[in-house]
Amino acid sequence: MQKRKTVLDIQRMKAEGEKIAMLTAYDYPFARLMDLEGIDMVLVGDSVGPVVAGYDHTLPVTMDEMIYHCRAVARGLGQAFLVADMPFLSYQVDLREARLNAGRLVKEGCAQAVKLEGGEPVAEVIRTLVDMDIPVVGHIGLTPQSIHRMGGYKVQGKHDQQARQLMRDARAVQEAGAFAVVLEGIPAGLAGQITEALDIPTIGIGAGVDCDGQVLVIHDILGLCEKYSPRFVKRYADVASIIRQGVKEYIGDVKQGVFPGPEHSFS
């Protein structure tokens, strides 16, 4: 039985040049399957809102929802490192709220670390959580909780001023004590520069190949989100078609009186 990965294992992977593979999970079955295949890190993302609950974006997701999904995922993991997103309004109000909510994700949700969005403006929050021994993953670039300010899901850091600010954000997150940082929706060249400049691992999503690791939404790589697929997603399977075909055959069997057959019935 493999032991659960720790912060030290993730940092060692960067030091040794081993790429870090990370995926989202929102329930026990998916978590168990990806853990069996050796995924390094699992993120219970607030992306559960649009991906699982059908929300338009991540902003409506609550702490209670995050804890519920985090607990389910934790039960499916044996060796992967578990990170939980801090949802909107769970850390922006004040430091006391941030400490309480991060603590709940660890205590009730069984997370090993929390992730929060922002650079320089959230450095104090990161420092506060690290001081209470909660590992933190930063998240800069395209931050989904900021979509109203950004005007949607737009690539960040394309202009010199933006790029310089993102470098400052990355350094601020590291100096505040984060052990890793997600770089989302930024030019590949800039992501490479940030990765080179930091001692902590960078996890890219739409940020090119030079990051220390990659993260994607499990439903995206399996083709379960049929309406929209971001450019940075590679689809590894078409599970939606398999599900629809299975449902179609089941409906047909029920309508025709073929199911349940004798082998599915008790005597």
Swiss-Prot record:
One of its GO terms (molecular function) is 3-methyl-2-oxobutanoate hydroxymethyltransferase activity. It is an enzyme of class 2 (transferase). Pathway: Cofactor biosynthesis; (R)-pantothenate biosynthesis; (R)-pantoate from 3-methyl-2-oxobutanoate: step 1/2. Mg(2+) binds at residues 46, 85, 117. InterPro entries: Pantoate_hydroxy_MeTrfase, Pyrv/PenolPyrv_kinase-like_dom, Pyrv_kinase-like_dom_sf. Its cofactor is Mg(2+). It is found in: Cytoplasm. Its EC number is 2.1.2.11. 3-methyl-2-oxobutanoate binds at residues 46-47, 85, 115. This is 3-methyl-2-oxobutanoate hydroxymethyltransferase. It comes from Syntrophotalea carbinolica (strain DSM 2380 / NBRC 103641 / GraBd1). The gene is panB.
